[in-house]
């Protein structure tokens, strides 16, 4: 059985979630923490650390169950943000694919992230080749 973890990174509006759905498998992202059962998105910046902890916990549970393909789509502008996922993947025998999704289609972020915040994310975005 081939086990894969896809880590999709990029700025808000780049198409991470759309690509994640295209890849198939089990899709998770911190934004899901803020979406209620009726599909309404209610972002609370004070809950962002909790949302990311929830996402990591869910990935850990899925890996423990041996789910073959897990796709995580978060901004992950800094490399340290991927480290917990890389560690879990190694411990559970997952091959990791890290993809940076660029906003080449002019997509808008659906969560109303202010342009100043996106600019800060862009300025701190780290890449390791």
Locations of regions flagged by a protein language model:
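Active-site signature of alpha/beta-hydrolase-fold catalytic machinery across serine-
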Residues: 22
């Amino acid at each position: 059985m081939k086990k894969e973890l896809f880590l999709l990174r990029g700025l808000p509006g780049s198409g991470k979630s759309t690509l994640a759905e295209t890849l198939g498998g089990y899709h998770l992202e911190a934004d899901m923490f803020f979406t209620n059962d009726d599909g309404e998105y209610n972002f609370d910046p004070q809950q962002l650390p909790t949302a990311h902890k929830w996402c990591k916990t869910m990935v850990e549970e899925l890996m423990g169950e041996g789910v073959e393909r897990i796709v995580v789509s978060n901004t992950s502008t800094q490399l340290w943000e991927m480290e917990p996922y890389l560690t879990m993947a190694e411990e559970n025998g997952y091959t990791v694919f890290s993809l940076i999704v660029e906003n080449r289609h002019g997509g808008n972020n659906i969560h109303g992230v202010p342009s100043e915040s996106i600019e800060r994310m862009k300025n701190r975005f780290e890449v390791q080749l």
